[in-house]
Amino acid sequence: MLDLNLNADSPESTQYGGDSYLDRQTSDNSAGNRVEESGTSTSSVINADGDEDSCSTRAFTLSFDILKVGSSSGGDESPAASASVTKEFFPVSGDCGHLRDVEGSSSSRNWIDLSFDRIGDGETKLVTPVPTPAPVPAQVKKSRRGPRSRSSQYRGVTFYRRTGRWESHIWDCGKQVYLGGFDTAHAAARAYDRAAIKFRGVDADINFTLGDYEEDMKQVQNLSKEEFVHILRRQSTGFSRGSSKYRGVTLHKCGRWEARMGQFLGKKAYDKAAINTNGREAVTNFEMSSYQNEINSESNNSEIDLNLGISLSTGNAPKQNGRLFHFPSNTYETQRGVSLRIDNEYMGKPVNTPLPYGSSDHRLYWNGACPSYNNPAEGRATEKRSEAEGMMSNWGWQRPGQTSAVRPQPPGPQPPPLFSVAAASSGFSHFRPQPPNDNATRGYFYPHP
C-alpha cells in the first residue's frame, strides 16, 4: 500500500536520531550531483543496514519529487527548487460538479463524497441526488362509444355474412339505430360519421376528419334525427333483410316478399291527414312547422266543396233540408217541356163515380216548390185525359153482394203503378192500399138494394 502522507514522522525517523528521511537524503547528495527534472518523478530504493534489533518489515520507501522540501540553508538552490509545490488530489469545494464531469454520464443512485470539509467537523457525508420528476405521459382519449367493431377497421360498421354487405349502426338513447347496408366498408363508415356528427355534435368519435363533412352538415342542419336517418337509408343499397333491387321490398325467411312503407312515412301520412281534417289544431307526430306548405294549400282550397253528395243543379243554390240529393224545379225534364206532375183523372166525373184509393187532386213536384211555370204541352195532356176517362170508367171497387169475377183489363198498354213497390234496398215494407170502411163509402159506392 502506498503511503501518500510522507511528510509525517515514519518509524525510520526514530532510528536515525529523529531526523526525517528527507533531511538525510539532502545531506548525502551533493548539490552538483543532484539532477532536477520537472514533471518527472524518481524513486530510490534504500536498503538500510540497520541494527540487528531493528524492524525487518521496513523494506523500501518511495520518494516523490513533487513532495521534496528544499533546505533553507542552501543558498545556491534555484527558487523553483526552494519553493514547495502543493497539489491537492481531492478538491475542497462542497459542490461535486468536477467529479461528476470526470465520472461521465454514468448515473448512480447513491455516491460517497470523499472531499474534506475544512469548515465542518470533517465528517463524511452521504449525498443523495434529488430525483428528477418523470414526464407525465399524455392521457390517451378514451372512447365513450365502446370498442371498435371486430369485423371492420371502422367504427360503427359490421360485416354480415348472410347478406354479404357492410351495415352501419349507431346507438342513440339506448337503442341501436340502423343506418343502412352498403357494398363497401368505406361507404358504411361515411354514413356512421354523418350520423354521429348529427346526433352528438363535433366532439363525436368518427372514423375520418371533421372537415370532410362540413358541406353535408350545412345541408341537413335543419332536419330532425328521423328525417336524417331516412335520408341515409335512401342512400344505402337496400334494407338489411332480403336482397331485393326495389326499395321498400323485403324478403322474409318464409320466402315471401313484403312491401313496407316504414314508420317515418306512415307518421308523415297521418300528420297530413290530421291537418286536412282538424287544421292547425291537429295533433301531429312531427313539428307543425314542417307542414307549412300543406297548411297554406289547405287555406287556398278552403272554398272547394269536398262533399261527395250528388247535385243536379248548375247554380250555387243553397242546400235544402240538409239533403245530399237536390232536385230543383228547373230540371232537365222541365227544360225539355215535360211536366213532372200527376193530374187527377177523375176531376170531371160525377160525385157517385168512385175514385181509386190514394189518388190526389194536387200536382206533385219533386222539389216541393209551388209551380209557377205552365208547360205548353199541358194542352195535349188534357186531350189525352178524356181518352183516359173512357178507359178508366169501368174501373172501380166491387159493390157488396156482387160475385168476385175477374174484370177484363182495358185494352192498350197498362200504365206502371206509381210508387206501388218500394225499393229492395230501402228497408221499407211494401205499401198496399186497403179499401175504405163502410162509413167512408158515401159518395163513392151505391147503397144496397
Swiss-Prot record:
Name assigned to this protein: Ethylene-responsive transcription factor RAP2-7
Keywords: Activator, DNA-binding, Ethylene signaling pathway, Nucleus, Repeat, Transcription, Transcription regulation
Cellular component terms per the entry's GO annotation: nucleus
Family named by the database record: Belongs to the AP2/ERF transcription factor family. AP2 subfamily.
Record field: compositional bias (Polar residues): 7-20, 27-46
The protein's role, per its UniProt record: Probably acts as a transcriptional activator. Binds to the GCC-box pathogenesis-related promoter element. May be involved in the regulation of gene expression by stress factors and by components of stress signal transduction pathways. Regulates negatively the transition to flowering time and confers flowering time delay.
Feature: DNA-binding region: 153-209, 243-292
Gene Ontology molecular function: DNA binding; DNA-binding transcription factor activity
Record CDD domains: AP2
PROSITE patterns xrefs: AP2_ERF
Subcellular location: Nucleus
Main location: nucleus
GO biological process, one term: ethylene-activated signaling pathway
Biased composition (Pro residues): 408-418
Gene3D superfamilies named among the record's database cross-references: AP2/ERF domain
Induction summary: Repressed by miR172a-2/EAT.
Record's keyword annotation contains GTP-binding: no
Pfam families: AP2 (PF00847)
Keyword field contains Transcription: yes
